[in-house]
Amino acid sequence: WSNLEENTASYSCPRCGAEIVCDKTTTATFCCYCHGPVVLNDKFKGEFKPSKVMPFKVNKETAIEKFLKWSKKIWFLPKEFSSYKQLEKITGIYIPFWLVTSNVTGEMSARCKRINTWVSGDYRYTKTDVYHVYREANLNFNNVPHNASSKMDDNVMESIEPYDDRELKDFSIAYLPGFFSEKYDRGKEQVLPLIEGKIRMGTNDILRNSISGYSTVDIVGTNERFNKTSCQYALMPVWMMTYSSGDRNYIFAMNGQTGKV
């Protein structure tokens, strides 16, 4: 761990306040959020050591190619956003995430109808059967992610998910050279309720999808019980580029593992 402190440093942007951590050999000439100048602040603090890291698989050339394809689909995008000078500023950055693994027992009650209609002679008949349906399941959710940086828009980060958590690695300084890395500033106590909300939705989706063969399904009640939950801090790879024009900020973000834009 002392090695980690010796080889990394923190830079603070005086314009937007973003705090970026990178290898000391990396030249920090602009903030990847606002492109303002950055200055050396302090060293990587031990309490911010991540447990896991998702290494970059997409290189800068591929990121630029995908950006150019993406930019052609966006109306009224300033031409300067895709200029050569701007393309050079596309940045690989490790974004802090909290990953939650949880075992959940989910329950769902529903009132379902099966409606049959037929015609006999001059009459049309309808038969409605009503069923009270109950579902219960024990489910495991592994490494459900959520952005741990207040500088990043949650919607932007969620739009480039998912990551393949099978490729998570134990954190090592060896993954940092050539990339920026931001420290988290949203503690797990802030983010955990948001992740639990995702897990509740996922549980209910699974239970709801198990109810089929009915004309109508009305959910009467749901319940989710978290039996066991663990949380770990990880760095996830993102290619980013921002551009400011007047009072508007344009953001391009791409999953550095899968290439999803």
Q: Which residues does each PLM region occupy?
A:
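Short Cys/His-rich micro-motifs in 6-15 aa windows
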Residues: 35-42
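Short cysteine/histidine-rich zinc-coordinating motifs and their immediately flanking basic loops
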Residues: 24-30, 43-49
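Charged, low-complexity helical/coil segments in non-catalytic cytosolic or luminal regions
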Residues: 23, 48-244
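Short cysteine-rich clusters marking metal-coordination/redox-active sites
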Residues: 13-16, 31-34
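Extended, hydrophilic extramembrane loops/domains of integral membrane proteins
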Residues: 236-261
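A generic beta-sheet turn/junction motif
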Residues: 15, 24-26, 245-247
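Short, flexible, mixed-charge glycine/proline-rich loop motifs
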Residues: 1-8, 19-26
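Cys/His-rich metal-chelating microdomains
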Residues: 18-19, 37
